[in-house]
């Protein structure tokens, strides 16, 4: 039985232990407002909707998203969209004292506090999963009647905003989808005036702003939609009405009762205390402080909880946070590493529930009768399904075909069973997908000159020639067959399909071949180039995320993997460096893995640093 042992995905997973002592607070905090969305605004999310807050004093911006809001269709890629923004404009000056902006990972609440003319101002931000809303609370502790500001809502595509009573609404249509978002302002004391494009608060003691939105996206529908604009309005309004009947105290209590038991399952204790300097100073000047490693690990878990709970879609290239309508690579679902990597920490970081959206996405699309994933396979006269590299939420798949991704996705379906031992899930959800995926490869594989079964005309993302028997494909198909046989054993399935699987598995090339300079070979015909610093480690799938290569199994292959990995070098983009960290850990080189981990903790500029500028849009 294969059980993944990764410790880095969205951020990093090192080694999680439960501690008897009082937990060290996990907080990102700063002494000034954010200036740039990508590098300094702070995220909140409930798995389906999310927001980024800047923490401005005279002006505040809350940019928000719904993970299902996409332009595009079943025939056009489109892109993930920015749903909109809330803009707060206060009657206070920009200068203040005691400024603090923080994100508490322990309770998933953002806070901004400062003092002006002896009055303390406090804001709290959170995204509630049980109530499906984003909440902003504004108070002046110890002072009454001091809140004076205007609130404006802006559609991410510059549509009209309707103001009705104390509610603001945006709505619109895209290629396939309709959408709506509402923001409700509730004031304690003072006055609220309704203007044509904003709400104005005067002399309030406290204010609660509740925000929510939805689209008519439905993954299971043949059209990928369910209901019209009126149905969306009813759904959003019902959600808002339910939240509006709760006090802020009850909304917050429900949020904490839902979130904290999940987050508190795991603690990484490296015997470090929370420092008294800001997080940017921690990263820039105190990287040897073990608190940074603790924070990095828990921030990864926080982001997973914020971008992948419930719903029909997994985390995308940016989780679910996006402030533009033309994001890099459309903020899509890349099948050659990115969407899979998002879920590497899920089980080992004890967030198994966060796997559900990815599993739903894969199983629904793979088994959709006549769906686009099945059509890709039919074009090659194969049963089952396959995908290309870039994928939107409507089944559209393009750029280069990535056949082995179907096997890769199935390793995740198996891993979820390996951790949960949920036999019902294995039988009803994972097994049907794994079976038809094997059938795809039954039809696709061919016999080589040595009598072994190989995948014809495959590549090694994202470089090199197309050849038969490329390591990337062979290692993944090997893992698929091995794990499907393990699933058959658990489910006591012994039929003609299993017999064929056993026969083909016995003849399958495992993709493990040692080359002329002692490396795991990437291709069978082309000689690997020593010193090739390609970001992908596709010829080392068997090392990580799969586990055919291990010092515990065969030292020769482990040593050859080490040679190949060392040849790739230590330079990398963020995701590639994470992969290298995991691989070096599998090779029992903790020093090298930790050195790369510390490199990953560098502050990134807006363009993603040197490698970010190199990795521009390809299509």
For each feature predicted by the language model, list its residue ranges.
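Extended, hydrophobic alpha-helical segments in both membrane/secreted and soluble proteins
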Residues: 338, 402-416, 429-443, 576, ...
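N-terminal signal peptide c-region/cleavage motif recognized by signal peptidases
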Residues: 13-18
